[in-house]
Amino acid sequence: WLANLSRLNVCSQKGLSERFDSTIGRGTVLMPFGGKNQLTPTEGMVARLPVLKGITNAASVMACGYNPEVACWSPFHGAMYAVVESVCRAVALGADPDKIHLTLQEYFPKLNNTETWGQPFSALLGAFMAQDALKIAAIGGKDSMSGTFMDKTVPPTLVSFAVSVIDSEKAISTEFKTAGNNVIFIAAPRDEHEVIDFEVLRKNLRVLHQAIIANKVASVGVIKEGGIAAAVSVMCLGNSLGFEFIKPFNDTDSLFTLQPGGFVVELADGLSPEDLFADIEYINLGHLTNSKLISLNETEITLDNITSAYLKPLETIFPRIVDAGAKVAEINQPLYKESLPLTAPYSIAKPRVFIPVFPGINCEYDTAAAFEAAGGIAEVFVVRNLTAVEINDSMDTMVKMINNCQILMLPGGFSAGDEPDGSGKFIATMFRNKKIQEAVNTLLQERDGLMLGICNGFQALIKLGLVPYGEIVDMRQDSPTLTFNKIGRHVSQIVETKIISNKSPWLNFVEPGDIHSIAVSHGEGRFYAPEAEIKRLFANGQIATQYVDQNGAPTMQMPFNPNGSLYAVEGITSPDGRVFGKMGHSERYVPGLMKNIHGNKDQKIFISGVKYFD
């Protein structure tokens, strides 16, 4: 069982996936890994379609299929199963099987003899057979016949991508949800030539889809390499649920067999399969438990052992965590509570929010949408730096827009490609221009304005001294900084942060002790400062948020503290709280997103900033 989970085509690739930003665009319906532990991989991508104004529930679905071991044995079967796998994974996410299209990507060795010419030919026949039987067409693709270098060749490769559009409210994730729920297996029979019975498969897909859109199914996993055993194990990990197979379970060998077109299905609310799947064949597998064990006849396997076997194989190549180093004493500081909400001395119905976009920034659309949804007027300006004249013109425009706004927002991204020796330097250099610096000082000190920096914007605020000092100053030896993540790479995931202090207008709508699930995506987010300076900031209520574990305790340990920030610091403020810098992308959430992640995801930062001017 454990050896099966440790195979390279079965084991976790989470450490690789986290290198890629999964939440940009404010449309991620399902995170790549779901459950409270974020360990169960999602069957594919579900994201709302991007719109400049408002919100849509229309979401795109994309799922892939390919098994290199099958393709090496038979390119025909490899391509046929690839189409089937991609379609099944799309249906498992909520797609209608009658509204799926495909795109195929092919990659084969150099075609220098009769045998190698037969590989793409047989693969295309297998793919066409599956498409014809499922009544699903491939409407695009790409191919390459250059997969040979000296004596090295790629396996015969035809990767199928299934694409569809769904209502994001109907999207369903892979991790098991609730103890007590029944779990079944739906199979697609194969003949003596290992060809799938497509008539049965089409019926299975339609019946399963109807159950999903009727909210009768809690989770669905597609059988891939590793068989039912791997599917059940991985689906348990997300929420630390155990599984008890029916007793006796006699056909244990079938648990490890590749069964293309098969599904593991968790029924919702203790429903019985007889009520939902009377028209198709299925097998009762068992039910979910709170035991943190997988029980098969007289054998019990702990989830701890399963987790270790599943995560360990690629940990040295694509690590998920690194040692946090020496423990920091007094990391758990008292909460700082401001008794009265902080408000502006004047009222503006729709405050203007100026969002300058520097080269490499990519969060301006998400940020503008968040402020406008809260009632503000977002004004986005793209800084031009192609020539000296354009830079000067951009600075003049920035001065005018700062003088005309109530809120200055520095969004996240990768300013100047996160240039060497620290990101955010280009932004900080621009803001140290005398005219811009005077405009910022006027906004903050004379007009009681607000300033917010997220991710790259936080890095710029730190380099300018706006946090924690409240004004643009030269950096001192003991000034806080943000440096490279302890793990030495980009990290994209959801973390939990706790409100430590509400001494800021940006936190008027939350209470100290509140915990939120927030997206992070950065390579340089590790907060560092001398211990005396950190304690001074705590005492002054300027440490606004900390990374916390599943028990709500501040921690230095990954993955809860994704970058190794000292004292688990995620966000800090200026002395008066009107300038706030944080790493987590609070702007990337709207209701209906990140459905496979637990917790309160609305930090109410943007509504707090806008309502400050009521």
How would you describe each model-predicted region?
Residues 298-454, 458-469, 483-491, 498, ...:
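N-terminal beta1-alpha1 cap of cysteine-dependent amidohydrolase-like domains
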Residues 264-268:
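Short hydrophobic/aromatic beta-strand micro-patches
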Residues 38, 87-96, 175, 219-235, ...:
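Conserved phosphate/anionic-ligand binding catalytic regions in large, soluble enzymes, centered on
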Residues 46-48, 61-63, 102, 139-141, ...:
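General beta-strand structural signal in soluble alpha/beta enzymes
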